[in-house]
């Protein structure tokens, strides 16, 4: 019922009349643009129907009332605006532009602000006027990127041409509009005021209809339709429409800024009747309103003042136009001081304020005085000048009054900018200027500040440029004015840059001081770089908002000279993978560094330059200096590369760690080679020469292998690069210098038993594992080793070791450690090395105690992180082979990559020595060897034999091949371990030396080569190539660890006997003789069983012994040995801490097991140790005694099965955490022979104590005295109660010889 009444005949507002269509609507406006009680306005013809409820019937752009058009409106700016974001779209309610009565195209625009939307109608000329106002007062076209609207086209298709243009224009403008719009004409175009409310015209808005009565709410009502009002009890409502007395159901009224209908019974009117003698005002809105029935009138009325004057004043105050109306009509002119800068420049038609122009010209001509802009002038002169400018008159500044008071002119200039309603740098950009100044880097800060300046309104931009150029010119006279750029910035900053938030809360103290600091820094930066910031050539195009380059810049070295710079490992991998067509992981393109960043990186590289050399340079002493060829790669901390998924890397690529671009061209010859993954060495640290240990990380991300370009200098380069014999087979003359020719071509890999080691302290001498046979299927790389993986690798097939290379590639399973690390060498070390390395020394050098060797071996070790350790374990752990392929022992066999060429003749010498700790250790080891030789010569009374080759080092556990003519030449002096009775413990800073097995040395006949693999599948290249497997296939089937070797005379071994573990018996001092062999060489190896229970866990590690020997040839001088090589044992003070080896009884050609750490308990009588010196002299050839250096490996992590959850202690050599004291180092002993075996070790993890030993495996018998073997655990054979194999390969021993250099593991 009520709804039907509400939609009935239209209810005309009181005070309006109409006589059908074409009549006029009269209303009084109460908008803020009109004065209170302003008189009637001009009528506006309505074009809508009778039910329009006050909606506009004519387009809003050209009202025929007091509200002017935009072109006719005086320009003004609001002082404060706060409306937020504004969205502008072409109105979807209209099908398109329509033609008005004046044949103009009219477009509907939907304006959305603060969650409210309304449509406005604008012509194309209005759009062009809006564009002109925007770019005159608000935006610069370089910042807004808005196109200038062209003149309206002519023709019938003009509308279709303009619609896409206006759509794009409004979309771009909506992204720019924020609370930075303070231009009155622009906001009026959108029908907005400065607070985001809709600004309605008086002729069209029902809100502007005057009220006929006031009422208060007595009953709450909730709106049921969009055109209804909701109110609560007690609210005040202005009633604008009241129906006749007989129909009082629905009234219309205003509550706040809302207009709508409401039930009449919900409100009560406030009635007011004039007194009987009071004449009602004709203009009163209550005049002629019949009093509703039921409403009682007031009993008495308040009398009004009488007289003409009061009436006139009252009429004037009601009809007085508002300030805004006067400014719009141009009647009220804004003063200069305190006027918005854009409004003042728009009204005056000038580019910069007249105040700034006059003051700056006067000060530059007459104001070069001390303290300009810092000292204040006379206040009366300042006020007089201000009044002159406000009156739009230009004062005469050249008068004597102002010439005598120049500071008043400078104070006036500062006062003008201080009184701007919006500062010169604007409130809106205060935060952006602060953020731009907080970025690091001068160039990036310059770009960011330049971008913020471009966001200034054009009047502010022009004024700022003029002012800053003036201040920069004044700063050049700082010698006369004492006002340089910083002082000028301090006095000008509060006038140019202010924060509205900080001003509103009125901060003081420290907060105000910080604001002043920010202001002064910004203004000083602008003053310093004014020529660049306001230059027409400077642009930030192609840069992101942070100032970083989006467009790649051309590099000067890219493709111009490939050999002029080094490539990192990542770049080399990316280029090689791209050349082979292998998909790589998507990476974010690196943006070119700015000049400032390049300078910082160059300075950082200069600081790291002392560590850019290699430890191999020790062997190039005396060969002349060379240019360092490698730079230290970043070690994995914050830039750790993610692990690669299985199959994502090519299997047929060989890479070097860091090579020039020129060397990558040689990769094509090795396309069929297996790429070995390398485990890089950690950085070293020394107390004397500190080098910060770098964090460890992924080995997969830095895996690399030796370059396949190290082919033979003979004809067949491709064949020799695939095999192991190629590099040296045809050129024996290069053998001596091949060690020093090209250190980067040396391919070293760690033994498989070194998986997961925390401290890889077998540097500077590195090791290399053999590679898998191509015939065996390659197991897929898995992140974790399977539990049932075998610990015994399979045997390699002979065809895999052919010089022609493998038939097909295999997956890499072994890692290679070859990345050198180095530091600078002080002059004292160089002098020491030079004295030790001179063949003929003028003055005798004192013999240094070999005790210094282990003290200097602590200088190159860094901790690997847990993540890296786990990854190394997963890479080194054996994986299950293909089904059906079992090792002789019945276990699955992991595969290793084939060997790569070891040396390449020719090439530049390695870089000069730069690692003091390693060089010192090698130098002292050499000196100790020389001492031993001299002492041996003095006791024997003979002349020392000339060394066959210069001082050389042990390279690898598995060297690829031996040159022709050198494998069997010369007499190789054997040696035997002779531990002393006293075994001093290591100092606290020495790492704990641990051992998983014995190190074996063998005596062999003259002319035989001593090469021995570490396991069944790790066979040296020259053995495989020589057809060793074809010679004795039946011997290989007898024992899982027996591999035929090259030679004719087999060696005889004695069966080792079992001894008690360390915690069940007291170790006995002394050495024990070796018994006769318990089985013939042709008999199969016996099965050794363990009779003891499970011991506690122990830390796995391995001691690597390096023999630094001297053969026949030229003399090799050095300090004399401090003990006789024919004594039963060296002095106690020289034993057990550095692994000194002595003589071996030659009755049988059997190896000695040197148990480096820990020693086994003694279980043999001392008479077994009786070996007279005369017997040894009779059986011992007069050869110099080799010297062995024991380099220990760091401890492993905690055991998974252990209940202890604490992490392992830091490495003893770590400078950050020295860790707890390490137990004393036991003496080195020989494993006694007997039917018993030491106790098995349950797993690779565990506490450091107690230390258990592995028992020796059945040794293999080969020809030529070559020995190999493996250390079994718990019997070594499955199916005999030994349990499942361990998740890591069992340690194996091997004997390796390269001329006069031998390695044992």
UniProtKB/Swiss-Prot annotation:
Which stretches are annotated as coiled coil? none
Bias-annotated ranges (Low complexity): 582-595, 694-733, 787-798, 916-940, 1194-1208
Residues where Phosphoserine occurs?
A: 32, 594, 660, 749
Q: Which residues does the annotation list for site: Arginine finger?
A: 374
Residues forming the SH3 domain are: 210-272
Q: What spans are recorded as compositionally biased (Polar residues)?
A: 646-669, 864-873, 992-1020, 1039-1054, 1115-1125, 1292-1305
> Phosphotyrosine occurs at which residues?
1188
Using the record's annotation, list all stretches that form the Rho-GAP domain.
339-534
Basic and acidic residues: which segments have biased composition? 596-608
The annotated region (Disordered) lies at 1-64, 575-818, 864-1054, 1115-1305
Spell out the Pro residues composition-biased ranges. Answer: 774-786, 895-915
Q: What keywords appear on the UniProt entry?
A: Cell membrane, GTPase activation, Membrane, Methylation, Phosphoprotein, Protein transport, SH3 domain, Transport
Residues modified to Omega-N-methylarginine: 1263
Q: Which GO terms describe its molecular function?
A: GTPase activator activity; phosphatidylinositol binding; protein kinase binding
Entry keyword Repressor: no
Disulphide bridges: none
Identify this protein by name: Rho GTPase-activating protein 33
Source organism of this protein record = Mus musculus
Q: Which gene encodes it?
A: Arhgap33
